[in-house]
Structure formats: structure tokens, C-alpha cells
């Protein structure tokens, strides 16, 4: 079931102004069709020698995973112009949801399993991105969920190589190094202190 939970501001790069977008929880067939119809052709048209790192992600399978395990998974997305602008799947419990950060070892956290913005919002895929801020809005939604679950804003995730700078520099997460138990991807955490700072810095 898909439910709109908030109106959020997205920066329209073409107009140079903020516009209203919908933050939703859950997913429906229309959203899955939107991703398939709108995202996939752009991914398919990308240079084969340099495909987007997340082009192979199957959001229908992720939706099914969330529907079958509602206590462990949550899906969130952002919609504007009747198109899906970004999607995120988070994990609320299980082996991935324990901190490795020295500030609070083994403390519970929200694990961001998958986070993707629509291809037309990515500078690497288009010379004129449509919206800015989709990834940050989804990430802050995960932080809010972490607070709601009484995890003090703590977040953990493994980053694709192309997104490492975003998590390290834009969100000021702690780079915990490469995880040889997880496809050698770098593992990042947002500690309790970092979550507090990120929330305080939010415009």
C-alpha cells in the first residue's frame, strides 16, 4: 500500500526554484510501472562501457521483499510531475542493523539497503538534471525513521563506488572502510552525534 506522508521541497534546476513534491511510504503498481517505463529506457541508453551502477536493481523484487517482511523493511519514494523521482529501501531489524561505530558499538540503527534517484536527476547521466536534493531528502527520511524507532538517528549503509563522495562529503558520514564480507563495498555510518549535527544543519 502506498501512502503519501509529507509534502517536501525539491529544487527545480530548470526554474531555479523550489517546488512541492510528495514523499510516500510503500509502493503500488503505478509506481513500479513508472520506474519501468521512465527509468529503464534511460539506463538502457547509457554507454555500455559505463552503465549506471544501480541499473540492474529490480525494484519490483524489492517491493515484494518489503511487502513480505513489513516488520523488517520499509519502502519510501519521492514523486513530482507524476513521475517517481527516487526510491529507498531500508531495513529496521536484523544482522545489518547494529552499529560498528566506535561511538556506540552494537547500538541499533536503520540500514539503508538501496537508495536511488531517477536517472534524469543525475549529473553523470544528463547535462541538464531536472531536480536536486532527492537523495538527501530520502536519506533524511531514514534518519527520521531512526529517531522514530528510538535509534537516535543512527544510519548504516554500503555505498556503490559512485556514491561514496556523496555520503562522505555531503552527508558527513563516517567511512568505515571496505567490507570484504559485502562485495568489498565501503561501509558508512551516521553516528548519533553526526545525526544531531545533520539535523541541526538542515535548512
What does each model-identified segment do?
Residues 1-129, 137, 144-154, 162-203:
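Non-catalytic substrate-recognition and accessory regions of acyl/acetyltransferase enzymes
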Amino acid at each position: 500500500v502506498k501512502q503519501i506522508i509529507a509534502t517536501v521541497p525539491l529544487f527545480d534546476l530548470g526554474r531555479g526554484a523550489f517546488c512541492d513534491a510528495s514523499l510516500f511510504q510503500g509502493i503500488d503498481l503505478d509506481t513500479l510501472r513508472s520506474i519501468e517505463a521512465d527509468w529503464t529506457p534511460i539506463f538502457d541508453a547509457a554507454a555500455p562501457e559505463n552503465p549506471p551502477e544501480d541499473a540492474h536493481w529490480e525494484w519490483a523484487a524489492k517491493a515484494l521483499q518489503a511487502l513480505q517482511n513489513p516488520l523488517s523493511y520499509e519502502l519510501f519514494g519521492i514523486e513530482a510531475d507524476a513521475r517517481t523521482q527516487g526510491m529507498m529501501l531500508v531495513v529496521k531489524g536484523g544482522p545489518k542493523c547494529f552499529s560498528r561505530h566506535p561511538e556506540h558499538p552494537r547500538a541499533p540503527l536503520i540500514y539503508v539497503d538501496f537508495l536511488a534517484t531517477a536517472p534524469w536527476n543525475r549529473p553523470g547521466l544528463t547535462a541538464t538534471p531536472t531536480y536536486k536534493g532527492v537523495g538527501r531528502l530520502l536519506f533524511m527520511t531514514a534518519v527520521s525513521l531512526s529517531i522514530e524507532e528510538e535509534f537516535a538517528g543512527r544510519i548504516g549503509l554500503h555505498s556503490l563506488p559512485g556514491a561514496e563522495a556523496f555520503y562522505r562529503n555531503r552527508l558527513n558520514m563516517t567511512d568505515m572502510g571496505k567490507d570484504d564480507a559485502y562485495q568489498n563495498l565501503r561501509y558508512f555510518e551516521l553516528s548519533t552525534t553526526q545525526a544531531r549535527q545533520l539535523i541541526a544543519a538542515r535548512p
